[in-house]
Amino acid sequence: MASFSEAPPGNPKAGEKIFKTKCAQCHTVDKGAGHKQGPNLNGLFGRQSGTTPGYSYSTANKNMAVIWEENTLYDYLLNPKKYIPGTKMVFPGLKKPQERADLISYLKEATS
């Protein structure tokens, strides 16, 4: 598996489309918005997994204690259930490096 440092440059516009079709049914990025089936992702970068106030995380997600950055998200988004065994996230992942890079590029803009 290639690392984020080897990933292609991300396109935030393409990432927004990916978010809307594959993520938005469970997540939002809007500041102050409530949680959906998954946690609100606003303020994601630099935050420890399992710590968004008001969201009920799996024990596995809380115990993983990963800090969400480009490199950790790149690995996580390949296969969330493999990265955090026991996570409640049902999304199977994004296998294409370009899609992961695009989504991360969008999330960097949309969640800050």
Swiss-Prot record:
Molecular function GO labels: electron transfer activity; heme binding; metal ion binding
Superkingdom, taxonomy of origin: Eukaryota
Keyword Secreted tagged: no
PTM annotation (N-acetylalanine): residues: A2
Alphabetical list of InterPro entries matching this protein: Cyt_c-like_dom, Cyt_c-like_dom_sf, Cyt_c_1A/1B
CC terms in the record's Gene Ontology section: mitochondrial intermembrane space
Annotated heme c binding sites: C23, C26, H27, M89
N6,N6,N6-trimethyllysine modification, residue list: K81, K95
Function: Electron carrier protein. The oxidized form of the cytochrome c heme group can accept an electron from the heme group of the cytochrome c1 subunit of cytochrome reductase. Cytochrome c then transfers this electron to the cytochrome oxidase complex, the final protein carrier in the mitochondrial electron-transport chain.
Protein name (Swiss-Prot/TrEMBL): Cytochrome c
Species name: Oryza sativa subsp. japonica (Rice)
